[in-house]
Structure formats: structure tokens, C-alpha cells
């Protein structure tokens, strides 16, 4: 009985303590609903080592358009005095996403530098999501200006399907646009799937300009000290799987701006725009023709690479819990 009384007293005391801290504005908890779209392109490359030139030359390039990919998500912001912790999660709606273009240079080994194969397929995002978590500290220089530094982690997952493609096929000495190239009309079939994961550890600096008590403008810049990607291409018609992965340092960057309107004490509305781009970085590539779960064989003399350029637009409503 005495133990229960002590626990009750402790709970009551702790509740009053939290409430007092909240009233002092030391603790803040905010929840946001986010709706947005991403628009851009992700590119994958294959490079082959050419002995007579003693260099890696581009053998293949696949350009996966990401046109107006809508997503829904939520965000939680927790702050204690000048420290903050944030978590964001969002999922894409399955949708058409532009064109997948596949280009090949099969004559590079013999010194023929023209593009020999070109195909275009309808691209679709079957599923995808992204997660972002960060911790930061805010420096308040005045009522007008604050600077916030965040250290975080971002994770992205995409699964694309390219289908119903048409193509022009030359050979190792014939370009795709030649009269001697062979034209293949739309196939009406699923052709290539791409499962891609990329994540990064990043550092973000955010300037907060408090124009009025009802309006903020917050430009920001983000750089990733470490980035990693891995992807599996399934060439369905040939039943070949390609696996490639790689990492890089200080190759991914982002800049953007957030605009916040606060018409009510507990409710605010946000608009954000950002542009993400990375310096192309290379990795290893492996293959098999036995199935995705079978061992992949590392391809000697061949390298892979990853690149992306992405616009992001989002709007959100934010509720201040306390």
C-alpha cells in the first residue's frame, strides 16, 4: 500500500514538473501532416575497362524518369530548449513516372564510340518510401535570426518497372540511327525492373528568419559526408539479374527553402522546396542468370555508377501539442 502511494505521489509530482516545464516553453512537441511530390531523374551507368585505351569507358546508361511522384507522410518535431529531434516518414503513391531510356555503346572495345542501341519504355513506380531522422541545436542571435545545425540520416527505397518499350538496335560498328539498325516496335511486355536503395549521413545548416510572429522564411543547405547505394536490375526478357553497389564521400548535396505561416497559436502551415543533386560515384557490379536469391558473380573489368537530380515540393499542416 505504501509503495503504491509513493508511486502515485511520484507520478503526480512528475506530471506537475512536466507541465511546469512545458509552461516555461522548454519542451515543444509538434506533429505535421505532409503532402508533396518529387520530380527528377535517377541514372545508372555501366563502365567497361578498354585495354587499348587503358581506361574505363561508358558501356551502358539507364535513365529512370521520376515525373511528378506524389507522396503522403508525417513528421514529428521534439524540442527541449535549444536541442531538437526530428523524424519524417513518407510513402509514394503507385503511379506512372515518365520514361526509362536505355542506351548502349557496344563498340567501345574496338574503338567505335557511337551509341549502338537505344530503347525507350514506359516507366512506373510500383512502390517507394523515404525516412529521415535528425538531431540538432539552435543558436538564437536575435528575435529576427536563428541558425540551426542538424546531423541526420536519410533512407530511400524505390521499385520501378519499365514495360512496353520500343528500340533501335545496331551492332558493334553500326549506330542505332543507321538505316541498317533494326527497329523493334512496342513489346507490350514487362522488360526491366529496378529495385534501388540509397541512404546517406548528412549535415544540414538552416537559417531561420522570423519576419513577424506569424511568418518565417528558412533557407537551408545540406551536404552528405557519406552516401551509399545498391540496386538490382532484373532484365526480365533475358532473365538476367544485375547487382551493383557503391559509396562515396561528400558527393550528395541539397539546398532549399521552407516558408512557415502561423495564423493560429497552435496551428501553422508550411511550404518547402528543395533540390538534391550528387556527383556521380562508382561501385562494383555483379550478375547471375539463376534468380535474385542466388549468388551473384562479380564482373571483372566492369564498374557501376549512380547519379540523381531531384526537385521536391511539399506542403504541410503542423499542430503544436505543447
Predicted regions and their residues:
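Generic N-terminal amphipathic/basic segments
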Residues: 21-47, 60
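Post-signal peptide N-terminal segment of secreted/secretory-pathway proteins
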Residues: 64, 73-86, 90-95, 99
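Substrate-binding/catalytic groove segments of enzymes
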Residues: 264-270, 279-283
Amino acid at each position: 500500500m505504501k509503495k503504491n502511494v509513493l508511486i502515485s505521489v511520484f507520478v503526480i509530482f512528475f506530471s506537475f514538473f512536466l507541465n511546469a516545464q512545458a509552461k516555461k516553453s522548454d519542451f515543444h512537441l509538434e506533429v505535421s501532416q505532409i503532402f508533396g511530390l518529387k520530380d527528377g531523374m535517377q541514372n545508372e551507368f555501366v563502365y567497361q575497362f578498354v585495354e587499348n585505351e587503358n581506361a574505363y569507358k561508358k558501356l551502358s546508361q539507364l535513365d529512370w524518369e521520376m515525373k511528378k511522384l506524389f507522396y503522403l507522410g508525417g513528421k514529428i518535431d521534439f524540442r527541449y530548449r535549444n536541442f531538437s529531434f526530428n523524424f519524417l516518414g513518407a510513402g509514394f503513391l503507385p503511379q506512372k513516372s515518365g520514361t526509362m531510356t536505355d542506351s548502349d555503346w557496344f563498340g567501345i572495345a574496338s574503338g567505335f564510340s557511337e551509341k549502338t542501341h537505344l530503347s525507350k519504355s514506359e516507366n512506373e513506380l510500383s512502390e517507394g518510401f523515404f525516412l529521415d531522422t535528425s538531431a540538432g541545436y539552435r543558436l538564437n542571435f536575435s528575435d529576427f535570426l536563428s541558425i540551426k545545425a542538424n546531423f541526420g540520416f536519410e533512407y530511400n527505397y524505390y521499385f520501378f518497372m519499365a514495360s512496353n518499350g520500343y528500340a533501335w538496335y545496331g551492332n558493334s560498328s553500326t549506330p542505332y540511327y543507321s538505316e541498317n539498325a533494326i527497329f523493334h516496335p512496342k513489346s507490350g511486355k514487362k522488360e526491366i525492373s529496378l529495385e534501388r536503395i540509397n541512404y546517406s549521413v548528412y549535415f544540414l545548416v538552416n537559417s531561420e528568419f522570423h519576419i513577424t510572429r506569424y511568418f518565417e522564411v528558412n533557407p537551408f543547405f545540406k551536404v552528405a559526408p557519406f552516401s551509399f547505394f545498391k540496386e538490382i536490375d532484373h532484365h526480365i526478357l533475358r532473365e538476367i539479374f544485375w547487382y551493383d553497389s557503391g559509396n562515396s564521400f561528400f558527393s550528395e548535396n541539397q539546398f532549399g527553402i521552407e516558408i512557415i505561416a502561423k495564423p493560429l497559436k497552435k496551428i501553422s502551415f508550411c511550404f518547402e522546396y528543395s533540390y538534391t543533386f550528387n556527383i556521380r560515384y562508382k561501385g562494383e557490379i555483379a550478375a547471375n542468370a539463376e534468380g535474385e536469391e542466388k549468388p551473384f558473380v562479380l564482373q571483372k573489368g566492369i564498374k557501376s555508377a549512380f547519379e540523381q537530380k531531384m526537385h521536391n515540393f511539399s506542403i504541410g499542416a503542423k499542430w503544436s501539442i505543447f
